[in-house]
Each structure stands twice: as structure tokens, then as C-alpha cells.
Design a protein with these regions (language model features):
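Hydrophobic residues in well-ordered beta-strands that form the structural core
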Residues: 5, 44, 69-71, 211
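A short helix->loop->beta-strand "cap" motif at the edges of active sites that frequently abuts
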Residues: 38-40, 65-68, 178-179
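NAD(P)-dependent dehydrogenases' Rossmann-like dinucleotide-binding region
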Residues: 72-76, 91-112, 126-134, 146-158, ...
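Contiguous beta-strand/loop segments that form the cofactor/metal-binding neighborhood of enzyme cores
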Residues: 136-218
Length: 242
């Protein structure tokens, strides 16, 4: 695999069709636009941008160049329990999806973080940074195309030394095919054996599914714990083994 010491050589290389971007969030949009103008498709780590102005520029560039702009929402693409839940919903196990409740707690590990991590202008705020995962899953599971943010709030309740940092956020969403609530934070306690107890509850007209994606507080080992309840079943699945 060839290595490049500068961006210009990479963009000039005709053999490269796709560029992956994981720079500081505020810089990702400009890099994506530059790559698309150079004839490359792009995939970005989330968040793909930090402002609406950046998003509009990205959309205009993608339309002008015909190149693909995509974001790697790893919680949907790479977490087995999320795919397992989708398969159960497609099989009719909980009827029509009415609501998602997405929880995204994270461990801060404050002494390992670079300065930009605490600067709102650099990372886009907690709803942009973390809750983009939960918004993506809301859209995915409800199928909503037209969405309104009914209410959102953020706060800094535990990190007074970083006044441009948000350590808590929540969103209430209404879509044309469902409702959603999201809560994200940087409060994972040290005793938890991993970085966060991420959960997703999907409510349907005939049942519901709860995902405990990364840890089960009851004590089951591993990840991707799925609970299904409907009119005929009340069961647990280890989705990591499916």
C-alpha cells in the first residue's frame, strides 16, 4: 500500500477513487469538498461536518461533481445487535415502529483528550459529535424522511474548567413515520467495564426491542445483548453470535 507524505500527491493519483477522512471535525467538510473536486468519492467519520453552512457546501459540491459523500455511522454499520434488530423488525416481530429511544453515554478520560476536544467550535458540540449516531438510527428504524427537532438542550455540569465543552445533551424528535428521544453524555463511571452503556429501545405497535450494545448490567458477558418482547415472545438473544 503506497504512503503519501502530502495531500496533493494523493489527490493527483488517478488510481485512488475513495478517500477516508477522520480529521478534527471542523476540518472534515473542507477536506471532503477538496477531495470531491479532485474526482474522489469520500467517506467521513462522524460527524461529517459541524455547521449547516458546511453541509450546504458539501451538498452543492456533491451535486456539481457527481461524487459520493458518505459518513461512517459505525453504530449502525458495525454493531451486530443493530442489524439483528432491523432483521426482526423486517420480519414483523414488533409491528410498525413508533419510537426510538437512544442512549449514548461515554467515558470522558479527560487527561487523554487533546485541547480541540473541549472547544465547541472545533468538535461541533455534543449533539453533533455523539448524538449524530442516535439520530441516524432514528431515521433508519422509523424510515422518517421529514423530521423536526421539537426540543433540544445541552449543558456542562461536571467540567467547569472547560467552558466551551458540553458533557450532556438531549433531543426530542418528531418524524413523519415516528418519534424519538435521545440522551448523550460524558458521565460513564469508572467502575463500568467499558466506555459506555449504550442502549437503544425500539417501540412498535406490536412489541418492542431493547439493545444493550456494549455491556449488560445484569452480568452477561460480551456485547450486543438484544431483548425482544411481543404478544408471543419474551426472549433474550446474544446478537454478537448471530
Amino acid at each position: 500500500i503506497p504512503r503519501f507524505t502530502n495531500k496533493e500527491d494523493l489527490l493527483k493519483n488517478k488510481e485512488i477513487e475513495l478517500v477516508l477522512i477522520a480529521d478534527i471535525p471542523v476540518k472534515r467538510a473542507a477536506l471532503a469538498i477538496e477531495c470531491m473536486n479532485a474526482g474522489k468519492d469520500v467517506m467521513l467519520d462522524k460527524p461529517g461536518c459541524t455547521t449547516l453552512e458546511q453541509l450546504k457546501e458539501i451538498e452543492n459540491t456533491a451535486k456539481k461533481t457527481g461524487k459520493i459523500f458518505s459518513i461512517d455511522f459505525s453504530e449502525r454499520f458495525e454493531v451486530p445487535s443493530v442489524q439483528a434488530a432491523y432483521d426482526l423488525i423486517q420480519a414483523g416481530e414488533i409491528g410498525d415502529v413508533v419510537q426510538t429511544i437512544g442512549m449514548g453515554p461515554h467515558r470522558l478520560n479527560i487527561h487523554t483528550r487533546p485541547d480541540w476536544f473541549f472547544d465547541y467550535d472545533q468538535y461541533g458540540g455534543i449533539l453533533c459529535d455523539i448524538a449524530s449516531h442516535q439520530i441516524d438510527q432514528f431515521l433508519f428504524f422509523t424510515g422518517s424522511k421529514n423530521v423536526e427537532i421539537i426540543n433540544s438542550s445541552t449543558g456542562n455540569f461536571s467540567n467547569p474548567d472547560h467552558n466551551k465543552f458540553e458533557d450532556f445533551g438531549e433531543i426530542l424528535i418528531h418524524g413523519d413515520k415516528g418519534r424519538g428521544y435521545i440522551r448523550v453524555d460524558w458521565y460513564t463511571p469508572d467502575a463500568l467495564p467499558n466506555w459506555g452503556d449504550g442502549r437503544l429501545t425500539i417501540l412498535g405497535t406490536k412489541g418492542y426491542i431493547e439493545l444493550r450494545k456494549y455491556v449488560d448490567l445484569v452480568g452477561r458477558e460480551g456485547t450486543d445483548h438484544l431483548f425482544l418482547v411481543n404478544n408471543k415472545k419474551y426472549e433474550y438473544k446474544n446478537a454478537s453470535k448471530e
